[in-house]
Curated annotation (Swiss-Prot):
InterPro entries: RNase_H-like, RNaseH-like_sf, RNaseH_domain, RNaseH_sf. One of its GO terms (molecular function) is nucleic acid binding. The gene is rnhA. CDD domains: RNase_HI_like (cd09279). Signal peptide: none annotated. It comes from Bacillus subtilis (strain 168). PANTHER family: OS05G0353850 PROTEIN (PTHR47723), POLYNUCLEOTIDYL TRANSFERASE, RIBONUCLEASE H-LIKE SUPERFAMILY PROTEIN (PTHR47723:SF19). Residues 1-127 form the RNase H type-1 domain. This is 14.7 kDa ribonuclease H-like protein.
Amino acid sequence: MPTEIYVDGASAGNPGPSGIGIFIKHEGKAESFSIPIGVHTNQEAEFLALIEGMKLCATRGYQSVSFRTDSDIVERATELEMVKNITFQPFVEEIIRLKAAFPLFFIKWIPGKQNQKADLLAKEAIRLNEKN
């Protein structure tokens, strides 16, 4: 069964202080991460959430991963391995590079209300960002 990873990025301003939330469910255990990422746009934060989630899974040696995001641009760019807005191209290139670590890689768009844990973690990361 694939490891499930819920990712979300948030920004207090566009751009503004930003954070990412990552919620991982692996073999009956759950891990939560709130990571401040400095000043970014909301869409940049969404891409960075996926990238950081992929890095966490790769370092843990997970082979089969299923990511969930409420960002349709991140889901589409990852599936198509391209993006119309060249601003996001470096993120897509990093995602393509990281995908090679996983024999089975899935990504699925979900409505925001199904991604509440990652959303709360991302908002907490903004608060942590603002404290520093």
